[in-house]
Amino acid sequence: MEMGDNWQVNAPWAQLVVSTKVPDELFKTTLELTDKIYEDVNRDSAGGSLAGQIHNEYYIAQEKLIESGLMEYFIEMTTKYWGTVLTNGNMWQACDRKFEHGPHGFNYACKIVSAWTVHQFENEYNPIHDHSNCKISAVMHLKFPEKIDPPVKEHLTGLDGALIFSGMGDADEWCTAPVMKCDSSNVGWLHLFPSSLQHSVYPFRGKGERRSLSFNADIISQKQLDSIVEQQKNEQEKIKIVNKGKGGKMNIIAADEENEKGEM
């Protein structure tokens, strides 16, 4: 990665965390969307699939991501993040050698695998963990408690309710910032990182809600994407429109019965 004249960083092993401020209007839309999800009695709980010792964690449906404009934004930011990773040292060439469907000249595509919202309250926490079945993860901070109780040892401030990246090691605090503090300065920021980077969220004491939105993304080659699109096209051609019953009601059924046995 060119950092200046005669200064190039070659660190393909580095776990890059990239932070970007979410556009104000999109942030407002996201806050409203997560409000509605939290209040919906039919919300889809994500708790069974997540590591958090947290009661309120809910999936965000793909159509909601698309309608809100989040899908387009997440794909744009993830693609930009992956481009940054590839320019770091020889990652581009290394991926091309190792994987059959590598970047191949930056010819790749991004897809959002899943997204969920986390509503964390007093004494709840997220233990150290990483994310599987994806390559890139991200978290957007939406809300922090207005005031949390001070720690028992008051000189150790800034950790309660904080997002901690553990994979960076105990580096000099002047060189790295592995702690995303639980305060208003971090609201509205999106942080992207490798899915393998271990992280946790500390508990806090006091009233109020700590809210975030997370998503997992995968990176595939354009060749893979074209293959998926072609496969979906072929599946669509197998679908028959069958006129059943009175009143001309139309039901769509798959010609291949095995499609009905597929996992969701």
Predicted regions and their residues:
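Non-heme Fe(II)/2-oxoglutarate
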Residues: 1-105, 123-126, 242
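Residues at beta-strand starts and edge strands
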Residues: 12-16, 111, 134-136, 209-211
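Solvent-exposed residues in well-ordered beta-strands and their adjoining turns
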Residues: 23, 120, 141-143, 216-220
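Aromatic-acidic/polar surface patches that form glycan- and anion
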Residues: 67, 71, 131, 184, ...
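Solvent-exposed amphipathic alpha-helical surface segments
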Residues: 85-92, 145, 220, 224
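A short beta-turn/loop motif at secondary-structure boundaries
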Residues: 105-109, 205-207
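Catalytic core of non-heme Fe(II) oxygenases with the double-stranded beta-helix
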Residues: 109-192
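Catalytic core of Fe(II)/2-oxoglutarate
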Residues: 171-264
